[in-house]
Amino acid sequence: MTTTAQVREAFMPLVARHSDLVLIGRFLIVRPVHHILRGVFVDRSSDKRSFEPHIVTYPLVPAQETVMLGWNPVWLYDQSVGMWDVTKPDTITAIRHHIEAIALPPLRAIKTFDDYIAHERAKSTTFYGHFDDRVFTNILVAAALGDFSKALQLRPQDERIERYFAKFAPDFFPALESGNREFIANTLHQWEAATVKAFKMEHIWKPTPFPLEI
């Protein structure tokens, strides 16, 4: 498996070339970070010489403790290159160019929740299904957008969601039902801050109002 030091050696040249990139551990993140985390997560592989980079996008809510690939990550692969071999300089150069050409343009285009939704809906549904079926995420996105009716309409679709909110945010759905925008906004901000702290991203996070507050 590749090491974090090898990831840093391979991808810091990208950070040097692009002022909106920062590397935190294995995560090459596009700045600014507001509500949506955008980047390339350079995962380990069963082969000690190989990187497995994925395009990753997901909201900072709910509160998360560890970096994850999120829903339906896009594996960056170039058939003409094959395995991203850390021991081959030409391969490392190729992966940098691949990220610049394939990953960065769509990631940079995601600036709002609507952009995020469009990005997720455009992904292949072969292995993970359609984004609109991701009930939990869509409840939170609808709440962030201020569409409380949609968030409440999605609520009955999954009993696991009821258990989650009963444990971590029992007042969330009652606040949606009463139209308490201040409570929902404060809850989302607290979750974002917790995720940012866990991911050690305080220095690149730009706290901003949610659409429901504007």
Give the role of each language-model region.
Residues 25-30:
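Long, charged, glycine-rich C-terminal linkers/tails
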Residues 3-22:
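Amphipathic alpha-helical segments
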Residues 33-214:
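Intrinsically disordered, low-complexity regulatory regions enriched in serine/threonine/proline
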Residues 2-3, 177:
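Short, charged low-complexity linear motifs
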